[in-house]
Regions:
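Conserved SAM-binding loop and adjacent beta-strand
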Residues: 164-177
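Well-ordered alpha-helical segments embedded in enzymatic catalytic cores
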Residues: 177-184, 199
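Conserved SAM-binding motif I beta-strand of class I
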Residues: 211-216
Length: 251
């Protein structure tokens, strides 16, 4: 069906179409880099450019990152706009201190322990290895800015592998995406999905939370959590894990 739009509405639609295309393009570029070559830029390369140009290492990384994902900043005005509206506000150098001092990370010990097919260990990000860190930011004009973080040093995080394959982790992204809902938790809390118990841990730490009920359908995960992780929680008596499907439980 053909729509007869006013000139102003036609302009708005054209702008929205352009923004949607740019949202899609930046997501594809980020996904290719993060999935295929996340450690392409090493610390030596970044710091060498920073020293040569007399700029902070974080700025050197962003410049190299732009080139690595295929943006032609000097010659292409569209690419310069992508760098300005997506990469400058969305690709951030992070301090590792808040994540290393997270109460869950400091309380729950993930030594090299094997339990059947499971192994408790640590994964790591290399210096200047970018990763998703937080929910995308939606601007007033419907631009979606992915939040990408990186550290200037190596950073390790709790990890569980299944038959040698990374299965679950507690990364800065988990901390960032759960921060708001943890802050709002109160009373009797119900949550779907156990993970490694990060949300349940932090919710149970709050005095205003009476109980935390977790619905999890993976019985193996529940056993692993009850045997190896839950005993380390200070407020474990507040937590109940039910083996059920979330949709079935809701009905």
């Amino acid at each position: 069906m053909k729509l007869n739009l006013s000139p102003s509405d036609a302009l708005r639609v054209a702008r929205l179409k352009k923004i949607t295309e740019e949202n899609d393009r930046i997501l594809r570029l980020y996904a290719d880099y993060l999935n295929l070559t996340p450690r392409l830029l090493d610390a030596w390369t970044v710091r060498d450019l920073a020293a040569d140009c007399g700029i902070p290492a974080a700025d050197a990384f962003r410049a190299l990152f732009c080139a690595s994902i295929g943006l032609e900043i000097p010659d292409n005005p569209d690419d310069r706009r992508l760098e300005r509206v997506y990469i400058q506000p969305g690709v951030r150098c992070l301090s590792p201190a808040p994540y290393r001092n997270d109460a869950y990370v400091k309380t729950v010990r993930f030594g090299d322990l094997s339990v059947g097919k499971w192994r408790f260990t640590h994964g790591e990000y290399h210096a200047f290895e970018p990763f998703v860190c937080g929910h995308p930011v939606l601007t007033s004009d419907f631009r979606e800015i992915p939040q990408i973080g990186f550290f200037e040093e190596r950073f390790s995080f709790p990890s569980v592998t299944e038959n040698g394959v990374e299965w679950m982790t507690v990364t800065p992204n988990e901390a960032e995406t759960m921060r708001a809902v943890i802050a709002e938790a109160h009373g009797r809390v119900l949550t779907y999905g156990l993970g490694l118990g990060y949300f349940a841990f932090h919710a149970s730490q709050k005095p205003e939370v009476q109980s935390v009920t977790v619905i999890e359908r993976d019985s193996d995960l529940i056993g692993l959590f009850r045997d190896c992780i839950l005993p380390q929680f200070p407020n474990r008596d507040k937590i109940t894990v039910l083996n059920a499907d979330a949709f079935g439980f809701t009905e």
